[in-house]
Amino acid sequence: MKNKLVIIGAGMASGRVIEHLMDTAPEAFDITLFNAEPRGNYNRIMLSPVLSGEKTYDDIITHDDNWYAAHGVTCRFGEPVVRIDRDSKVVEAQSGPVPYDTLIIATGSAPFVIPVQGKALPGVISYRDLDDTNAMIEAAEKGGKAVVIGGGLLGLEAAAGLAERGMEVSVVHLMGHLMERQLDAAAGYLLRKDLERRGITIHTEASTQAILGKDRVEGVLLQEDQVLPADLVVMAVGIRPEVQLGKDAELQVARGITVNAQLQTSDP
């Protein structure tokens, strides 16, 4: 009898797991793959070229529907798992419980949203997945002004892509120079000048106090009452491990779900 393997999350990690199992033990597992997104595995690293128009979604698909079907994987895309019942060894999803013998949690990370007034207004998005990218592309078709909060790599890629699509872009960064985790001040200065030559306005040592608007976003309030008009606000201020399922299942959790050298959780 095959081992019932349930995998939560259809990102690059779980994709590599399935590839390895197909290579080493193709008949050993009956695999069910859940993903909160309504699609399978694609290369998130390449979302920025999709935003800028250099690539399309089809170009960055890692495993398409035919690949999953050919390998006998049952796909439950667009259906997030809401609960893990460790005692009964089932996962609870929208359509009901699914039993498992082995469970792999590969939920990845979620974007961090700064806790300011107006963060939930329409027109305020994070930059994490294809839906976020498509929302930015749709906004850019209308033109207007975009404010990107965060001057790290992801934020600058968002800014460059939106500028490439014709938006007037400002970057708001809390620290003294851009990409401070990767660059020293001198290199950050050169990067800033390059972005400014592309028409992107940079605000460093700038703290977001609130996001303004009534029915949708209209601007970003910085310190000293400076307001940047905005038709679109993109938050790119980092990520946090997605651990809520593990916490709810009373697995050991620290900065992420705690595992040993064999990637086994506290419920091996």
PLM segments and residue spans:
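Beta1-alpha1 glycine-rich phosphate/pyrophosphate-binding loop at the start
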Residues: 1-74, 161-183
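Short hydrophobic core segments
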Residues: 8, 81, 98-108, 228-238
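Residue-level detector of alpha-helix initiation sites
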Residues: 12-16, 38, 109-111, 131, ...
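Rossmann-like dinucleotide-binding cores of NAD(P)H-dependent redox enzymes
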Residues: 61, 145, 155-212
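A conserved short coil-to-beta-strand element within the FAD-binding core of flavoproteins
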Residues: 77-89, 204-216
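Glycine-centered tight beta-turn/hairpin loop motif at sheet-sheet or coil-to-beta transitions
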Residues: 93-96, 223-225
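Glycine-rich dinucleotide-binding loop and its adjacent helix/turn
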Residues: 107-165, 259
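FAD-site-proximal beta/loop scaffold in flavoenzymes
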Residues: 120-143, 215-221, 227-268
